[in-house]
Amino acid sequence: MDKVFELKNVSYFYTPKVPALIDISFDVKLKEKLFILGANGSGKSTLLKLMDGLIYPHEGQIRFFGKVIGDKRTFDEYEFRRRVGFVFQDSDVQLFNTTVFDEIAFAPLQMGVKKEEVEKLVNEILISFGIEKLKDRPPHRLSGGEKKKVALASIIVINPDVLLLDEPTNGLDPRSKKWLLSKLEELNQKGATLVIATHDLEMAKKFSDRIIILNEEHKIETIGSPEEILNDEKLLLKANLI
C-alpha cells in the first residue's frame, strides 16, 4: 500500500463553536515530503496531533496504512508508536530526561530493546548527529539548535517510517537550519515519509514534493506542487503567508 495516511472529512473543535479544523481530506504517500502551510492559528499543529493519535477527530476518520487510528479492534498502538515519530515545535515539551544520553535512550528502552543494544544505538546516533560531546549535559541547558538536534535524535533512534515535524526550523540560526534540512533529506533518501507543518516558504520551496495550504477558516484551501502554490501570489496572500 502506497498510502501512509488517509484523512477523510476530518473535523476537530476546541469547543462546539470554535473549530480548529473543518472537513479535512487528503492522503500522504509513501516516502513523500508533504508540507502543510498555513498562517498561525490555521490548525497546522492540531492536524499533526490528530495524525499522531495524540487527539482524535470529532468527525471523520484517519487511517494509517489502512487501519483507523484509535480503533480498538484493528489498531496496534505499540506498532504505530514504533513507526511514527513526532517532533514538537517547542523542543522543551519533548525533552524531560536528566541527560542527553538518557533522552535518546528513553524510547528504545520503552520499546523493550536490551540495555546493551540501546547503548550501542544511542552512541551511533550521538556521532551521526555530531552531539557526542553533549551526552552528559542536561537538555534544558542546551541552545535552541542543540535542543532540536536532541529532540530529532530521540525520535530517529527508533528508526520510524514516518516523521511528523511541527515548525522544525522555528528559532534556528542559519547553520542549524542548514544542518536540519540536510539531515531530513538524508532520512527521506533512506525511505522515511516526512510530513512538515510550517510557514517557512523558503524551506517548502527547496524541500517539498507536495504542499497543502490551510486557510484561516481552518479548511484546506488547495493542494498542489511547490511550483503551482509558491508562485501563486494571490493564493499566498489569501492564506496570509506573505
UniProtKB/Swiss-Prot annotation:
Family: Belongs to the ABC transporter superfamily.
InterPro entries: AAA+_ATPase (IPR003593), ABC_transporter-like_ATP-bd (IPR003439), ABC_transporter-like_CS (IPR017871), ABC_transpr_CbiO/EcfA_su (IPR015856), ECF_ABC_transporter_ATP-bd (IPR050095), P-loop_NTPase (IPR027417)
Binding positions (ATP): G38, A39, N40, G41, S42, G43, K44, S45
EC class: translocase
Chief location: membrane
Cited Gene3D superfamilies: P-loop containing nucleotide triphosphate hydrolases
Protein task: Probably part of an ABC transporter complex. Responsible for energy coupling to the transport system.
Gene Ontology CC: ATP-binding cassette (ABC) transporter complex
A Pfam family of this chain: ABC_tran
Origin superkingdom: Bacteria
UniProt key word Amino-acid biosynthesis: no
Protein name as it appears in the record: Putative ABC transporter ATP-binding protein TTE0246
